[in-house]
Design a protein with these regions (language model features):
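Short, well-structured N-terminal submotif of metal-dependent ribonuclease cores
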Residues: 1-37, 46-64, 123
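Short loop/helix-cap segments at secondary-structure boundaries that form the rim of catalytic
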Residues: 111-119
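Acidic catalytic patch
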Residues: 63-84
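Alpha-helix capping/helix-boundary segments
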Residues: 10-11, 41, 73, 93-94, ...
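Acidic, metal-associated active-site segment
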Residues: 45, 88-104
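Short, polar loop motifs at secondary-structure junctions
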Residues: 50, 107-112
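Generic enzyme active-site microenvironment
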Residues: 5, 106-107
């Protein structure tokens, strides 16, 4: 695995000090693996940077890629939502980012992601 992509649930688990997620982030750093965070997922999870030190640290650390929802990705997200008859822009953006990076998704809600992208490898926390 080249790295992992976080959805909002994975980020919230990190913020809540979930030991599995902390270990995964530490292992990724030790092995030089990339961590991808779609900006849409960050927007769902971030509420108070000063009170969310683990999350704030993750987005600043080397090896973390924060991916904006730009024009091409917005189009890919819209096409994916149309193809799957779903409406969650954030989950679709996570799927687009994870597929492009060839990464598994750290999530707490596998059902929603499986509806949008059944082919993705999911790490459920």
């Amino acid at each position: 695995m080249s790295g992992v992509t976080f959805d909002a649930g994975g980020l919230i688990a990190l913020d809540r000090n979930d030991r599995r997620v902390l270990a995964l982030v530490a292992r990724a750093a030790e092995r030089g693996m990339r961590i991808t965070i779609p900006a849409t997922a960050l927007a769902q999870a971030m509420r108070s940077p000063a009170r969310q030190p683990r999350l704030s640290r993750l987005i600043r650390q080397a090896g973390t890629d924060l991916i904006a929802l730009n024009g091409p990705d917005a189009t890919a997200v819209g096409l994916l939502l149309a193809r799957t008859a779903t409406a969650d822009v954030v989950d679709a953006h996570v799927a687009v980012c994870a597929r492009r990076a060839g990464e598994a998704v750290v999530t707490s809600d596998a059902a929603d992601l499986r509806r949008i992208a059944p082919d993705l490898k999911l790490l459920v926390v």
